[in-house]
Amino acid sequence: MSGALLWAKAEAQRISSALVTGTTNMVDAELKLAQKLHGRVRDYVQWHHQDERCRKGISVLEYGPGTVRAFQQKTLPLVIGLRGETSRCTLVDRSREFLGDIAQLSSALGLKIEFIRGDIFSGRRYFCDDEAAFIVMFGRTFGNLAVPTNDTHPMEAVVETLKKISNSAKRCWVAISIGSDLRRDVAKSYYEAHPEFQLNVFYRMKAELPVDGNFDPEAFEYEPDVIGGDQFMQVIHTAVVKKNLDFCIGGKDIILLSGERLHLKNSFCFSESFFKKCAHRAGFVPIDVLSDDAGSAIHVLQKVN
């Protein structure tokens, strides 16, 4: 099964599990917040007060759009609601599969979307100085900061990452989805219930990278390690090798031994006050926070020029 299909399957399982147990899952909770964002976005960009902006529209940039389902439900309404004569949509993701699936959808709908396969934290400029952009990062992707696995305060990493996002456009607003629930036991139980979301990276490797036939994406099991303080929580997503592997990727020989632990990525959650403080230091003004009782939040920021 491809990484994209495995991810979509995991999304469906989370939603089904929530319906059975009566609990709230991350996918559904964020969708509800995204719907609130759809209804308020024109107020954020002062749509009704600037005739030129209303005519030209606001371009949309999304970092890490993910699956077709996620794009349809969370991002597409923003693209449609903000479009104008010169506005455009740009999607940036590392996954060729995810971008390819959305490209088929956009073609069917007659949408003009630019697909860029690359690092979402590169700090690249995507828009000209005279373009206004609304930048979104759903799926708590922002929390996947590349920092060491220790209790070091992540403020510097958060500020620097926000500055990279700020560099995407001279004039922009940013909506970032993050987790706000700092309870470690809740986070550990949540991620343990859905290992497919983390292990899909190995299926993506098999499908998208030059890996030889000796690589087995099923040779890994998932374990979350959780650390943090009173303003942040860091989930260290770890893959444990279940059997010895000897394979070649891009001409380089790789040997993994049973029992080895691989640090896949991080998932950070932040308190509201901590994230706002980081936003100010990065040159943003917080203009809204959409939140719920399930530990999900979307912070809306405006770049200060």
Curated annotation (Swiss-Prot):
InterPro entries: MeTrfase_dom, SAM-dependent_MTases_sf. Keywords: Plasmid. It comes from the Bacteria. This is Uncharacterized protein y4iF.
